[in-house]
Amino acid sequence: MKLLALAVLLLAVCSLEGAFVRRQAEEPNLQSLVAQYFQTMTDYGKDLVEKAKGPELQAQAKAYFEKTQEQLTPLVKKAGTDLINFLSNFMDLRTQPATQ
């Protein structure tokens, strides 16, 4: 019985000591968290710039731009033509009642 009581007492003291040590541990403050965040973002940016310098990525970007331009040019021309036609029809409707 004494052994059981001693074991429970020892367990209670150890758990209280552990909680006390955890409270005394230094918690990271906001300034260090912000500094760590900016350092991580800076490192990521540097890695991204190094990857972007590669000729393979530049070639992919150029090919993507050219493909997009090829697909969008006819659409933009058609939209411009449709807009001109719409505006000319609108202007024709305004001038007809004035001449009658």
UniProtKB/Swiss-Prot annotation:
Any GO CC annotation of this UniProt entry: spherical high-density lipoprotein particle
Biological processes per GO annotation: cholesterol homeostasis; cholesterol transport; lipoprotein metabolic process
Pfam annotation, one family: ApoA-II
InterPro entries associated with the record: ApoA-II, ApoA-II_sf
Localization per Swiss-Prot or TrEMBL: Secreted
Signal peptide coordinates: 1-18
Superkingdom of origin organism: Eukaryota
Keywords carried by this UniProt record: Cleavage on pair of basic residues, HDL, Lipid transport, Oxidation, Phosphoprotein, Pyrrolidone carboxylic acid, Secreted, Signal, Transport
Modified residues (Pyrrolidone carboxylic acid): Q24
GO molecular function, one term: high-density lipoprotein particle binding
Record-stated family: Belongs to the apolipoprotein A2 family.
The protein's role, per its UniProt record: May stabilize HDL (high density lipoprotein) structure by its association with lipids, and affect the HDL metabolism.
Subunit structure: Monomer. Interacts with NAXE and NDRG1.
Name of the molecule in the record: Apolipoprotein A-II
Organism expressing this protein natively: Neomonachus schauinslandi
